[in-house]
Amino acid sequence: MGSKSTRKLWAVHLAKGSKVTGKKEPTTMTLGKAFRGRVLGIDPSLRGSGFAVLDYAADGTARILEAATLKLHPKLSMPECLGAIGNQVDDFLNQHSVDHVAVEQTIYVQNFQTAQILGAARGAAIGSAAMRGLPVFEYAPLRVKQAVVGMGRASKEQVARTVQNITGTNFELRFDESDAAAVALCHAFTWRDTSV
C-alpha cells in the first residue's frame, strides 16, 4: 500500500464536498480542580528524614501545622530505622486528617548501596501511607525547587527562606523539615483533580 501525500489527501477530502474555512473550532482545556486540604510532605532518608503537614486553604494560603526531623542513631540497624520511619508517618497520619502524601524522589546517586538505602527509606514512608489507602505522589527535587522557589537549582537556604515566607512560619525549620514542607507545597501548587 503506497502512502499518499498531504496534498492528495486534501484533494480527496475537498472532492467529497468538505469545505476549508479559516476558522478553527474552539477548544477548551480543563486543568482540573486545584488541591485544597492537608498534605504530608516527606523528605526521606535513613538517618534524618523530614516531615511536614501542610494545610492549603481554599483562598490559597498555606500554613505548616507540624514539622519534625527524625534523627536516628548510627548504631541502629537498617530494619530498626525503617520501622521508626514507618512509625513516624503513622504518628503524623494519626494526629492529622491528611488528604494526600507527597514524597521527594531519590536523586541520582552513583553508589548502588546508597540508592538501595534511600529506596528502602522511601519505601517505609510510602508503605505506611499506602496501607491506609492514602494517595501518594512523588516529586523530583528539581521540580520541587522550581515550583516553590522558581529555580530548580536553589540552595537549601533559599528553599527554607521561601517556605517560611510562603507559610508565614514564625519558627525556624531544620533543612529536612523545610525540604519536606517544600515537597508538600509543590504538591499543593501543582496537583489537579482531573476526575471532575
Where would I find each of the regions flagged by the language model?
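Phosphate- and other anionic-substrate recognition elements at nucleic-acid/protein interfaces
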Residues: 1-196
